[in-house]
């Protein structure tokens, strides 16, 4: 009997060892390191209605984890101009004055979400307060670190997280791209420099977890897929079947101060304001006041206007991002972390989109629904899509059972336009919002798609004759 009992106990031990550790993943204490896209930044703004929709925050909410963030009340903290407000569909934007109003400043421990807009990998390893010099020349640092004397990396490690998320540390490339000034080794850090900081991050978090990394790291997307670089085409017309490109001043023949940019040049979205007055436009195409003047080649720090990205610069950026991603893959995997391919996710959105019962979310600027007004960061819908893909990834790789996000909450309003997050969506409201965009035939295909049954609800008045447009809450379009 004793031998039988010993055999049974041994068998239980063997079976327990045979069960993958991922099947017992603990999501009770999630900690995030990263930058703007991981912090819920959107519309050029860091503010509560974006922060509570940050994709890591959505994931933590779905996982039932206590997830504290450095929330900022309206109007939030924006880019140099402030938070973007759509004024008309030209598009024209107003900018709300940046006013930091912290809502969770007295939390007696570090935040779970330590992602800070504008952060570099080197910022996470070096910065304890805002300074005048890179990588710590960021006033948002003090809103998050609160004079603790510790870096975000040190704070994250001190929480002893059960699950680590290392988000998109891509400002090393994005900063150079959005400025339009890509100088290898100056505005674009060498791969070895990036890798050194990233290794410190993953090694430190692995040690904080007892020597085994449990969590996920994210790759950096291809900047050429962002709406910021695709909203404005370099082709402004066609003459006798030949494309007419915008005008620049690089690569022109000797003695020629302005010429058409080569194919493959990217025109950052803010340049649209210059083009409206004629910059970059041949006078033969449109005799605007500034026609025949080139668009700037490099960014202007004083005005915030970026510069054109020429094919050689785009190629260098893509190569460097691929090199960064290779280092992320190697370093994270060596420490036990899984690698979430953010780059493939964004590429899929921009190439084919994502379908939700007849509604396709794409990467098109303003029209697509994935990118916010700033053209770089997602909308609440976009963040929810990222969160759902991340949930699928964690469930598949760690044997978890985190429930999917109810996309209807985001597709028909989101938290900032009428629906309090975390509360059930009223099915009548869902149908009324759906009727604004789709026919009854499309609506009939919805039962079960979003986890709600709409078949028993009456169609809104007037929908039989086609879509009607209700008042859109939270967005004023003049």
What are these regions (language model features)?
Residues 19-24:
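Sec/Tat signal peptide C-region and signal peptidase I cleavage site
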Residues 8-18:
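Bacterial N-terminal signal peptides
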Residues 30-44:
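Catalytic nucleophile-elbow at a beta strand-turn-alpha helix junction centered on a G-D-S/GDSL motif
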Residues 1-9:
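Bacterial N-terminal signal peptides that target proteins for export
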Residues 30, 54-59, 363-415:
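Histidine-centered active-site loop/cap adjacent to the catalytic His
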Residues 229-319, 326-378, 413, 424:
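Mobile gating loops/cap/lid regions near enzyme active sites that modulate substrate access
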Residues 45-200, 410-477:
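Conserved SGNH/GDSL esterase-like catalytic core that processes O-acyl groups on lipids
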């Amino acid at each position: 009997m004793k031998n039988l009992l010993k055999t049974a106990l041994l068998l239980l031990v063997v079976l327990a060892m045979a069960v993958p550790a991922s099947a017992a993943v603990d999501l009770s204490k999630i900690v995030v390191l990263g930058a703007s896209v991981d912090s819920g930044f959107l519309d050029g703004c860091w503010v509560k209605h974006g922060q509570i929709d940050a994709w890591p925050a959505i994931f933590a909410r779905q996982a039932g984890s206590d997830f504290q963030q450095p929330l900022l009340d309206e109007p939030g903290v924006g880019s140099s101009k402030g938070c973007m407000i759509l004024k008309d569909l030209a598009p024209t934007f107003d900018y709300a004055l940046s006013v930091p109003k912290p809502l969770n400043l007295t939390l007696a421990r570090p935040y779970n979400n330590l992602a800070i807009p504008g952060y570099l990998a080197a910022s996470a390893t070096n910065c304890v307060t805002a300074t005048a010099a890179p990588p710590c020349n960021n006033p948002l640092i003090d809103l998050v670190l609160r004079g603790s004397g510790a870096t975000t990396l040190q704070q994250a490690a001190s929480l002893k997280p059960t699950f680590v998320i290392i988000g998109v540390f891509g400002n090393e490339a994005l900063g150079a791209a959005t400025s339009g000034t890509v100088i290898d080794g100056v505005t674009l850090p060498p791969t070895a420099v990036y890798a050194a900081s990233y290794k410190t991050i993953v090694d430190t978090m692995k040690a904080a977890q007892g020597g085994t990394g449990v969590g996920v790291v994210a790759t950096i997307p291809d900047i050429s897929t962002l709406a910021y670089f695709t909203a404005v085409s370099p082709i402004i017309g066609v003459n006798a079947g030949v494309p007419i490109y915008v005008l620049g001043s690089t690569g022109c023949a000797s003695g020629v101060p302005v010429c058409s940019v080569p194919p493959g040049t990217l025109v950052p979205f803010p340049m649209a304001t210059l083009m409206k007055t004629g910059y970059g436009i041949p006078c033969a195409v449109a005799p605007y006041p500034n026609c025949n003047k080139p668009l700037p080649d490099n960014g202007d720090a004083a005005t915030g206007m970026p510069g054109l990205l020429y094919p050689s610069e785009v190629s260098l950026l893509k190569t460097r991002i691929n090199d960064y991603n290779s280092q992320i893959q190697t370093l994270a995997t060596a420490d036990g972390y899984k690698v979430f391919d953010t780059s493939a996710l964004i590429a899929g959105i921009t190439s084919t989109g994502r379908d939700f019962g007849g509604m396709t979310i794409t990467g098109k600027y303003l029209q697509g629904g994935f990118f916010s007004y700033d053209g770089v960061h997602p909308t609440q819908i976009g963040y929810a899509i990222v969160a759902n893909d991340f949930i699928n990834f964690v469930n598949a790789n760690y044997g978890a059972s985190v429930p999917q996000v109810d996309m209807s909450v985001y597709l028909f309003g989101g938290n900032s336009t009428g629906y309090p997050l975390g509360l059930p969506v009223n099915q009548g409201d869902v149908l009324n919002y759906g009727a604004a965009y789709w026919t009854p035939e499309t609506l009939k295909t919805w039962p079960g798609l979003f986890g709600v049954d709409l078949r028993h609800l009456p169609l809104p008045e007037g929908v039989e004759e086609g879509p009607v447009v209700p008042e859109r809450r939270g967005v004023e379009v003049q």
